[in-house]
From Swiss-Prot:
Gene Ontology cellular component annotations, sorted alphabetically: cytoplasm
This protein's encoding gene: tilS
Alphabetized UniProt keyword annotations: ATP-binding, Cytoplasm, Ligase, Nucleotide-binding, tRNA processing
Protein name per Swiss-Prot or TrEMBL: tRNA(Ile)-lysidine synthase
Family: Belongs to the tRNA(Ile)-lysidine synthase family.
Nucleotide-binding found in the keyword field: yes
Chain segments annotated as coiled-coil in the UniProt record: none
Keyword Calcium attributed: no
Length: 367
């Protein structure tokens, strides 16, 4: 972009792909005080000043280090100098497990954004984080879909706190060292969290593997780009199928047909729907999901099953997914619409899909 530095131009290009619906309300910026999030804050501030947008900086303090309070307050002073509203979200007493800390952090951020009538949270994930995620997932045996890494735009990973909140990662195309060089040029320092160098954490071990020599010989980010292209194609196919065959009604999520899906795609789509119907944060995975999808697609005598907290029943013209106990969770239709929007590759589908709760009367029979 004319007149902008490379980091600012990359940041603004990433946000330019988002719909106004997400940007017209206060935009949350997650800022820990580390280099990545601090660069994110500066870039977002300059973008917002030019575009007339409103930012809300959010710092989560888990209270696990003596320095954390001072670091959060330092972010607050910087925000005050820039005229940005800043909230410190204190989560003292949280369980020290990484998974629990992550969930608590995302829940607090999502609640605060929703309280400010916002829909979008910006995070400082970089190209380095993407490469580390690739190695972590490869080590865990993830398939190609998972190896595509983090999405530029996704739904909040927590539920129900994250209902209506999206996460954008506008720095995924920028290396960490480039952001640190940007901060040095601005005369800004940053806080270093010792846990980022603790080999007890898997991400730190993967980071150490990504030495310059490996990056030259194993183009991890090039592999991620290729898998992302494949994922876009796969997501588009699932989105088109969902648009034609899936509706949320009062009795459950209704699916007209899985016909024509390759087995792997059918399992992936079914997992997404089971996650939504059960109101869970993760979909079921593995052999049980694959077998269930195969049974639904290939067997004309399918009568029902349970998986992932859901009961799957066969009706005359469709199958129905609903929680094993009780009604569908509140917000199910909106969550289904938002999931479809992410899959479409066009976030404007969020507005077009919102509120679709009716059940198609002309669903095509599956059996």
């Amino acid at each position: 972009m004319l007149g902008l530095g490379p980091q600012q131009a990359a940041f603004e290009a990433a946000l330019g792909a988002l719909p106004d619906r997400l940007l017209d309300t206060p935009v949350g910026v997650a800022v820990s005080g580390g280099s990545d999030s601090l660069a994110l804050l500066i870039l977002a501030h300059r973008w917002a000043a030019r575009r007339g947008r409103v930012l809300r900086a959010l710092t989560v303090d888990h209270g696990l280090r003596p320095e954390s309070r001072a670091e959060a307050e330092a972010v607050g002073r910087l925000c005050a100098d820039m005229g940005i509203e800043h909230d410190i979200l204190r989560l003292e007493g949280a369980a020290p497990r990484q998974s629990a800390l992550r969930r608590g952090r995302h829940a607090a951020l999502a609640r605060t954004i929703a309280d400010k009538s916002g829909h979008l949270l910006l995070t400082g994930h970089t190209a380095d984080d993407q490469a580390e995620t690739f190695l972590m997932r490869a080590r865990q045996g993830s398939g190609w879909y998972g190896l595509a890494g983090m999405r530029p735009l996704s739904l909040s990973p927590v539920w129900p706190e994250g209902e209506g909140v999206f996460i954008a990662r506008p720095l995924l195309g920028i290396r960490r060292e480039a952001l640190r060089a940007f901060l040095r040029d601005e005369g800004l320092g940053w806080a270093d969290d010792p846990s980022n160098d603790n080999p007890a954490f898997e991400r730190v071990r993967m980071r150490r593997l990504l030495c310059p020599e490996m990056s030259r010989n194993v183009p991890v980010l090039s592999l991620v780009d290729r898998f992302q292209t494949l994922r876009m194609i796969e997501d588009g196919a699932i989105w088109r199928w969902m648009t034609a065959n899936v509706r949320a009604g009062e009795a459950g999520i209704h699916v007209a047909s899985f016909a024509g899906h390759p087995p792997e795609r059918a399992a992936r789509a079914l997992g997404m729907l089971l996650q939504i119907a059960a109101g869970r944060e993760m979909p079921p995975r593995g052999e049980s999901l694959r077998r269930l999808a195969e049974e639904i697609v290939s067997k004309g005598d399918f009568r029902g099953a349970t998986l992932g907290g859901c009961r799957i029943t066969a009706r005359r013209t469709h199958i129905c997914l609903k929680p094993e106990c009780g009604p569908l969770p509140p917000g199910t239709a909106a969550r289904l619409a938002a999931t479809q929007a992410i899959l479409s590759g066009n976030p404007n589908e969020i507005a077009a899909s919102a509120g679709k709760e009716s059940f198609l009367e002309d669903l095509v029979p599956i059996f």
